[in-house]
């Protein structure tokens, strides 16, 4: 074998040995893969805003009637208004 081929194979094998073995997609998945867009504000008991570097804005709501958790579409008008008020309240001087 050529020395260059052996060197390249050694580098590839070293890189494979140093990796964790799991692809990024399997090691971390976004909690909200699907969004509910028909959730009324009156049915929400609690909102949780998830801030993760690999995922878009994710909002999880606990519903009043059945205590179920659902992911809410962040594009809903009442969610946008809620976020705007929360940010204004937090950063108000």
UniProtKB/Swiss-Prot annotation:
Region (Receptor binding): 39-41, 48-50, 60-70
Transmembrane spans: none
Binding site for heparin: 41-51, 62, 69, 85
Keyword Nucleotide-binding: no
InterPro entries referenced in this protein's UniProt entry, alphabetically: Chemokine_b/g/d (IPR039809), Chemokine_IL8-like_dom (IPR001811), CXC_Chemokine_domain (IPR033899), Interleukin_8-like_sf (IPR036048)
Annotated positions for site Important for integrin interaction and activation: 45, 48, 64
GO molecular function, one term: chemokine receptor binding
This protein's UniProt keywords: Chemotaxis, Cytokine, Disulfide bond, Growth factor, Secreted, Signal
One Pfam family here: IL8
Source species, domain of life: Eukaryota
Keyword Signal in annotation: yes
Location of this chain's protein in the cell: Secreted
One BP term from GO: induction of positive chemotaxis
Motif (Receptor activation motif): 22-23
Sites marked Important for dimer formation: 46
Leader sequence segment: 1-21
Regions annotated as coiled coil: none
Annotated region described as Receptor and heparin binding, given as residue ranges: 29-33
Disulfide bridge positions per record: 30-55, 32-71
Family: Belongs to the intercrine alpha (chemokine CxC) family.
Described function: Chemoattractant active on T-lymphocytes and monocytes but not neutrophils. Activates the C-X-C chemokine receptor CXCR4 to induce a rapid and transient rise in the level of intracellular calcium ions and chemotaxis. Also binds to atypical chemokine receptor ACKR3, which activates the beta-arrestin pathway and acts as a scavenger receptor for SDF-1. Acts as a positive regulator of monocyte migration and a negative regulator of monocyte adhesion via the LYN kinase.
Record note on quaternary structure: Monomer or homodimer; in equilibrium. Dimer formation is induced by non acidic pH and the presence of multivalent anions, and by binding to CXCR4 or heparin. Monomeric form is required for full chemotactic activity and resistance to ischemia/reperfusion injury, whereas the dimeric form acts as a partial agonist of CXCR4, stimulating Ca2+ mobilization but with no chemotactic activity and instead acts as a selective antagonist that blocks chemotaxis induced by the monomeric form. Interacts with the N-terminus of ACKR3. Interacts with integrin subunit ITGB3 (via the allosteric site (site 2)).
Record protein name field: Stromal cell-derived factor 1
Originating organism: Felis catus
